Amino acid sequence: VAALGLVHVPEGRRIFPRLTVEENLEIGAYLENDRKVIQERKEQVYQLFPRLYERRQQKGGTLSGGEQQMLAIGRALMQNPRILLMDEPSMGLAPVLVDFIFEIVQKLNQEGRTILLVEQNARLALQVAHRGYVLATGEIILYGPARELAENPEVQKAYLGEG
């Protein structure tokens, strides 16, 4: 699936705690054999997340939750995915880091990547999404343009704490 351009950023980050930041990133490029391409991708990740560059020799397990989320996203980007599946990227993060992660999601999308975002923070998800789907007990109950969903009274009451 990764070879087809579909890469997953899992819920709970699932980094390799005993490997360094740099080693975690390199594992993300496991399908790439060209060391120059791998280095270029690492540099792109470090530009997106300068904190990871500062911590590149640090073990992944010693990073904060926000840094681990950056690493999980960076590892996925090492595959140069066309479609990025992100599962609960804001889970367990401080509000300032949640905002930063969502800024990165928007930036990646603006650069041409398709992002499928599963997120319980409906307000932020609808702010960055083009389209939204509301699920209840595994069934799609509402869908449409994100702005329309954000303005829907049912969605506002049930998921956005309004009304």
Where are these regions (language model features)?
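Helical segment within the ABC ATPase nucleotide-binding domain
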Residues: 98-111
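Short, glycine/charged-rich "phosphate-handling" switch motifs in NTP-dependent
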Residues: 131, 143
